[in-house]
Amino acid sequence: EQKGWSGHLSDRLNEILPKERILTEEQMDRHTTFRTGGPARYFLVIETRKELAQVLAWLQEEALPWFLLGNGSNLLVGDRGYRGAILHLAGEFLKTEIDEATIRCGAGAMLSAVSRSAMEAGLTGLEFASGIPGTIGGAVRMNAGAYNGEIAGVTESVEVMEPDGRCRVYNREEMAFGYRTSIVKTKPCVVLSTVLKLQKGDRSEISATMQELSAKRREKQPLEYPSAGSTFKRPEGYFAGKLIMDAGLAGACVGGAQVSEKHCGFVINRKNATSADVAGLIQKVTETVQEKFGVTLEPEVIFLGDFEK
């Protein structure tokens, strides 16, 4: 019975995508920067808008949950995996075009690569993003930022596809950007492309700023271990890393997951951690900080799949 059903599912899918871009039971530890996570029932690599619209229609017909994966650099997938479809954009979604001070980039393009292209074109405004390890789509969805810059500050418009396959463009105001959020985080849709508006600048100055931020990052962050970057959002009026340190949690472990001693705001995969280890440590940190300081730390990381004890 079960086999027949999944056979019928994949027949339809084979009409939409070539079979080398339809992966089943794909281990998600290969696709997240935490290097943890169980199998996704489907992992679909999508290269065109037409394919995307057809896949979204198929998912809706089959009532399958789906999640759009960028670089997996802000994502914790449960050890039992995800029983829906992971969508990953490639092909035409990787393109970047620069016209004067405007950059149009596909949602699958890497933010750090776009930042580098901007520097090479003598455009300033994206320096802050040079070390952020995500895609443009993910950066827009969560309004990624670092070193006093955020993507909202340079976004002119964002094109999305709704689950019904229709495309629409949001301007900056309509994007409703906030701290680590935007309209596309709060409603189901897929970011297709983004237009960024930068300023003409001095290439060598831009490059120097990027190198300086990069050195700062290496010095202060535990880049030598798998992690999802900053694990917690910044609580109003505090710094997460300092609260965690002051709570005596530097180096605290659950299984193979550890609060980085180099930067307490980072939970790292120190040694073969599972997602349950990471989730357990996040919970331990949250509870301890709440208890000691009465401050609620909210994870910045997205949890996908099953995290029941």
Locate each region found by the language model.
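Residues embedded in well-ordered beta-strands within globular domains across many folds
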Residues: 86, 127, 159, 301-302
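Short, basic and Ser/Thr-rich N-terminal targeting/leader segments
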Residues: 62, 69-71, 154, 225-226, ...
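Structural signature of FAD isoalloxazine-binding scaffolds in flavoprotein oxidoreductases
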Residues: 38, 44-49, 76-94, 141-172, ...
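Short acidic (Asp/Glu) patches
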Residues: 112, 142-144, 173-179
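A gly/ser-rich beta-alpha-beta helix-loop segment of oxidoreductase catalytic cores
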Residues: 115-156, 227, 231
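Conserved active-site and cofactor/substrate-binding residues in soluble primary-metabolism enzymes
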Residues: 4, 8, 29, 47-50, ...
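Anion-binding (especially nucleotide phosphate/pyrophosphate-binding) glycine-rich loop
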Residues: 4-136
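Phosphate/pyrophosphate- and phosphate-bearing ligand-binding catalytic cores of soluble enzymes
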Residues: 23, 75, 161-288, 292-309
